[in-house]
C-alpha cells in the first residue's frame, strides 16, 4: 500500500505521500507519484490502495470538479455517491485525500466524505503512524511541510509498505 498525509497549519495546506508500490510482499517500484495537483492546480489529491483503481477515481474526481468548479466538497460528495452505488466503481479498492485552499477531505468507497478536525489526516498502510506523529507535532513551531515530512518519515520507519521517497505538494490555505 502506501501512506498519504495532509497537514493544514500556518496558512498552508501540505499533502505528502511516499512512492512505494508493492505487489504482495515485493516492492515493485519505489518512486511512484501518488500525490498530484488536479482541477487546474487548485486541488491536491493523494491516493492509497490499488493504483489502477485510484487513477480511475482521480479521473472521476477531475470530471466532478469540472462539473462543480470551485466546489470541492460537492464534487467529493458526488464522487462518493457514484463510488458507493455504481456496480463497477463499488469494487474499486482505494482511498483518497483531497484538499484545496479551504477544505481537506478523505473519500472512501463506503461513501464516506470525512473532514479532519485536528488539522491533519492520513490514509494508507502507515496512515495511523503518520497521523499520530502529526498530531504530536501540530502544537510545535514546525511548519506544515515539516510536520508532513517528519510524520511520513516516522511512518516509513515503522510500516514496511511505506518508503522514504516523498512527493510533497503545497497550497496557500485560507
UniProtKB/Swiss-Prot annotation:
One of the Pfam families matching this protein, by short name: Proteasome
Record keywords: Allosteric enzyme, Cytoplasm, Hydrolase, Metal-binding, Protease, Sodium, Threonine protease
Molecular function terms from GO: metal ion binding; threonine-type endopeptidase activity
Lineage, highest ranks first: Bacteria, Pseudomonadati, Pseudomonadota, Alphaproteobacteria, Hyphomicrobiales
GO CC annotations on file: HslUV protease complex; proteasome core complex
Alphabetical GO biological process terms: proteolysis involved in protein catabolic process
Species whose genome carries this gene: Agrobacterium fabrum (strain C58 / ATCC 33970)
Oligomer status and interactors: A double ring-shaped homohexamer of HslV is capped on each side by a ring-shaped HslU homohexamer. The assembly of the HslU/HslV complex is dependent on binding of ATP.
Subcellular location: Cytoplasm
Protein EC: 3.4.25.2
Name recorded for this polypeptide: ATP-dependent protease subunit HslV
Binding site for Na(+): 156, 159, 162
Record family assignment: Belongs to the peptidase T1B family. HslV subfamily.
Amino acid at each position: 500500500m502506501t501512506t498519504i498525509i495532509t497537514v493544514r497549519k500556518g496558512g498552508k495546506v501540505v499533502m505528502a505521500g511516499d512512492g512505494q508500490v508493492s505487489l504482495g510482499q515485493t516492492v515493485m517500484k519505489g518512486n511512484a507519484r501518488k500525490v498530484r495537483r488536479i482541477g487546474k492546480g487548485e486541488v491536491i489529491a493523494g491516493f492509497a490502495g490499488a493504483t489502477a483503481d485510484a487513477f480511475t477515481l482521480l479521473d472521476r474526481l477531475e470530471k466532478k470538479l469540472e462539473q462543480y468548479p470551485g466546489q470541492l466538497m460537492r464534487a467529493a460528495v458526488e464522487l462518493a455517491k457514484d463510488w458507493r452505488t455504481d456496480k463497477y466503481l463499488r469494487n474499486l479498492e482505494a482511498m483518497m485525500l483531497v484538499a484545496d485552499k479551504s477544505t481537506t477531505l478523505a473519500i472512501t468507497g463506503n461513501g464516506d466524505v470525512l473532514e479532519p478536525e485536528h488539522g491533519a489526516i492520513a490514509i494508507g498502510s502507515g496512515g495511523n503512524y503518520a497521523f499520530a506523529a502529526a498530531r504530536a507535532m501540530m502544537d510545535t513551531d514546525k511548519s506544515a511541510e515539516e510536520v508532513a515530512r517528519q510524520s511520513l518519515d516516522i511512518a516509513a520507519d515503522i510500516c514496511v509498505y511505506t518508503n522514504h521517497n516523498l512527493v510533497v505538494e503545497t497550497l496557500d490555505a485560507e
